[in-house]
Each structure stands twice: as C-alpha cells, then as structure tokens.
Swiss-Prot record:
This is GTPase Obg. Residues 128-148, 375-407 are annotated as: Disordered. Signal peptide: none annotated. GTP binds at residues 166-173, 191-195, 213-216, 283-286, 314-316. Its cofactor is Mg(2+). Residues 385-400 have a biased composition (Acidic residues). It comes from Pseudomonas fluorescens (strain ATCC BAA-477 / NRRL B-23932 / Pf-5). The gene is obg. The keyword Metal-binding applies. Monomer. Keywords: Cytoplasm, GTP-binding, Hydrolase, Magnesium, Metal-binding, Nucleotide-binding. Residues 129-143 have a biased composition (Polar residues).
Amino acid sequence: MKFVDEVSIRVKAGDGGNGCMSFRREKFIENGGPNGGDGGDGGSIYMVADENLNTLVDYRYTRHFDAERGSNGGSTDCTGKKGEDLELRVPVGTTIIDAGTQEVIGDLTKAGQRLMVVQGGWHGLGNTRFKSSTNRAPRQTTPGKPGEQRDLKLELKVLADVGLLGLPNAGKSTFIRSVSAAKPKVADYPFTTLVPNLGVVSVDRWKSFVIADIPGLIEGASDGAGLGIRFLKHLARTRILLHLVDMAPLDESSPADAAEVIVNELMKFSPSLAERERWLVLNKSDQILEEEREERVKEIVDRLEWTGPVYVISAISKDGTERLSRDIMRYLEDRADRLAADPAYADELAELDQRIEDEARAQLQALDDQRALRRSGVKSVHDIGDDDWDEEDVDDEDGPEIIYVRD
C-alpha cells in the first residue's frame, strides 16, 4: 500500500433540523394549542486513531466529508432525529491542523483516541416552545443552525523510540534488518529507502523498542534536495537518534565529510531536533582493515568534535549490534524512570518536543511556499523587487483580489 503522510481534506458537520409549526387538531377540539416539535441536532465529525492503519492514502482520493443533517421537527411534539455522527479513522500518530489558521487542533497518539473536529448545528425550535399566557397560538419557529465547516491538514508522524539518520547507502536499512524482523529493501544504489520503515527490536524476552528508518539525507536537503527532508518530521517523536556513518564508502569519499553533512542538515532543519540525544554509529567496520579502523574513528570523532557515545558496528555481520541494542534499551528504561521521578526533567523534555514540532512544521511550510513560488515562475520571495509594487493599488479597494492557493 502506498505510504502517504500528508493530506488536506474538508469536513462539514450536519446542519440542525428546523423546528415545526403545528397545532393540535382533533375531534371536538377545534382550536387546540401548538404542538410543533424541535428539530434534531446535526451530526458531528470525529477523528479516531486506529492502530491497524499506517498510511493516510484513503484521504488522498476522497477529500470531502459531510455528516448527516438533523431531521426537522414534526407535529404532536415529535422531535426530529439527530444526524448520525461521522468517524474518520486515521493512523496513530496523526496531527490534525486547521489549514486556515495553522492551529493544531489535536494530536492522536493513542489507539482509540477520539477528537471532535467539527460540531453539528443546533436544532431549531418548534412553535410549542413559544407558547405563553399571552400568546396561546404562536406561529414562531427557528431554523436549525448550520454545522461547522473546516479545511484540515492531516500530518502523520510514525511513533518510534529510535530514529536512524544518515546519508543514502549508510547501511540504515541493513541495520534495521539485522536487529529486527523488518525487511526493508536493501540494494547497492542510493535512495533504496523511499518511505519510512519501522522495526521492533526485541531485547531479552519481555523488552523491546521500535526503530524507524527514513530515506537518506543529502547535502542541500534543508533546501528541498532529495527525499529525506520531508521525512525528518517522523523523527520528531523519537527518544534517541542514531547517526549512522559509512566507514568505507564505495566512492572512497571521506566518512568525516559525510558525517558533517548530516549534522549541518539536521541543524538547518531543526536546531531543537539536533539537541535530542544522539549516538554516533560507525557502520561497515568489516570492510576496512583493523589497523585503519581506529584511525578512521578518530578522524570522524575529531572532525565532529563528538563527545557522546560512539559505536563501531557491522550491520551485515551483526558485529556490535547486540551491544548497541542493549545499551539503547537501558537508556530508554533509565529515561522513563527519570521522567516519572523528576517533574522538572519531564517539563524540559516536553518543551523540547514542542519546539521540535514547531520548527519542523515551519521548515516544511517554508519549503511548500518556495515550491508554490517556483510553480508561479518566481524563484524566491527575494526576486520580487520594489518595481513590482504599485502604490496606486493601496487605495484601489474596488480592484480584483488575487488569492494564491498553495497545493
């Protein structure tokens, strides 16, 4: 199934039913009082997190959703039927954003979580409601209120404990195959991975964590080059990042240069994401001589001025992967214990998570704006000079209004 992690939809709640104007008419009762019933409330629309879904592809083809309208009221004080609520199922990890205001309406991070995105219109009142001591036969009713309507943007971020970073062909997919049962495609050419892959890594019998592999980054990714930059948002919810570096590139380029590219692109995309706990994992150690290994490790560590943990592994032969997996599990457990015991630490991480979300969304929005400008024939906003501004347009309120709609 095609992996889709961003869609735009329009949702419209049901209108409320109108109130009824009716009077009681029975045998021997010629002038009975009012008996018009109220209308029914319109149906609302809810987003529901479904653990069985992993893509938003269903919303790529069907984009408009309407809830049922409430029925009109009836005679003999009959209330109209309420419109049926509509549930839209989305994968766990979906963020719902108002496309008009860019306000985050909600974040569905748990299976079964339910969020109302538009509310149905209120019912109209029947003429019975307006009966009084001075008005015995009211002919007044009210119509149902219209239901809310919204344009929404749905963003899916995979939920994983560990995220993998690296250039194409750094061995990320091979690594995830070696430590989990996931079987992502592996080949000897760049960009083999086109969508995020998840794998569950079992440590001992009852312990496990989820690891996410995203398409590789390249130099200039923060400016829109390559595939990986749009998928970096999937690492926003991870607890730890593994920076994989190919120690023996086929083109004999410098591994230190490759490592530096990833660090720079990560900083440009989100400085806060770069603050996340990050471990350096030097892969493909089996392809270089043992006497050269230490020298190459030192070169990479010195170039990056690295002070964090460093692991030298070979994903294909599983050399060093078990130790790395156990250390990750230990770190995740210690982190969870500290979160429960230290409220200040929990607040600090929550604030970091929010900054990462905000920076990632702003960066992707800027890339979308840039793409829209290119489609309109403008390379960038800086290409619009002062000569393109007509001061006469300021007072011309009757002129045409041009609205540019971003795809």
